[in-house]
């Protein structure tokens, strides 16, 4: 399989793109290099290779939900740069 200049012109027309003749020639050359590389990959025997990633076999890894001691409210308020009673004042993020 190879890409011709006519193929590049057709796709460019569909995408409403305009290219110089030199650019078209470069595209033909680059696309043919890619296709040749893919053909080489097709020759590779992968019968004995295990599937490395398959989204159908991925499982969620859940952790235990353990309650742990956290900071006391007074300690949080004392460490906050600004506070209003029991609330920490933070800079405005969204206008």
UniProtKB/Swiss-Prot annotation:
Pfam families: GatC
Keyword line: ATP-binding, Ligase, Nucleotide-binding, Protein biosynthesis
HAMAP family reported for this sequence: GatC
General function of this protein: Allows the formation of correctly charged Asn-tRNA(Asn) or Gln-tRNA(Gln) through the transamidation of misacylated Asp-tRNA(Asn) or Glu-tRNA(Gln) in organisms which lack either or both of asparaginyl-tRNA or glutaminyl-tRNA synthetases. The reaction takes place in the presence of glutamine and ATP through an activated phospho-Asp-tRNA(Asn) or phospho-Glu-tRNA(Gln).
Keyword Nucleotide-binding: yes
GO biological process: glutaminyl-tRNAGln biosynthesis via transamidation; regulation of translational fidelity; translation
EC annotation from Swiss-Prot or TrEMBL: 6.3.5.-
InterPro entries named among the record's database cross-references: Asp/Glu-ADT_sf_sub_c (IPR036113), GatC (IPR003837)
Catalytic function, reaction form: L-glutamyl-tRNA(Gln) + L-glutamine + ATP + H2O = L-glutaminyl-tRNA(Gln) + L-glutamate + ADP + phosphate + H(+); L-aspartyl-tRNA(Asn) + L-glutamine + ATP + H2O = L-asparaginyl-tRNA(Asn) + L-glutamate + ADP + phosphate + 2 H(+)
Database matches in NCBIfam families: gatC
Complex and partners: Heterotrimer of A, B and C subunits.
Protein name, UniProt field: Aspartyl/glutamyl-tRNA(Asn/Gln) amidotransferase subunit C
Keyword set includes Nucleotide-binding: yes
Domain of life per record: Bacteria
Family: Belongs to the GatC family.
């Amino acid at each position: 399989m190879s890409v011709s200049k006519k193929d590049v012109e057709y796709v460019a027309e569909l995408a409403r793109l305009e290219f110089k003749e030199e650019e078209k020639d470069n595209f033909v050359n680059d696309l043919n290099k890619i296709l040749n590389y893919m053909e080489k990959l097709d020759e590779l025997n992968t019968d004995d290779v295990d599937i490395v990633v398959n989204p159908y076999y991925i499982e969620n890894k859940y952790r235990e939900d353990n309650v742990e001691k956290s900071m006391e409210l007074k300690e949080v308020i004392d460490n906050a740069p600004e506070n209003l009673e029991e609330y920490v004042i933070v800079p405005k993020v969204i206008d």
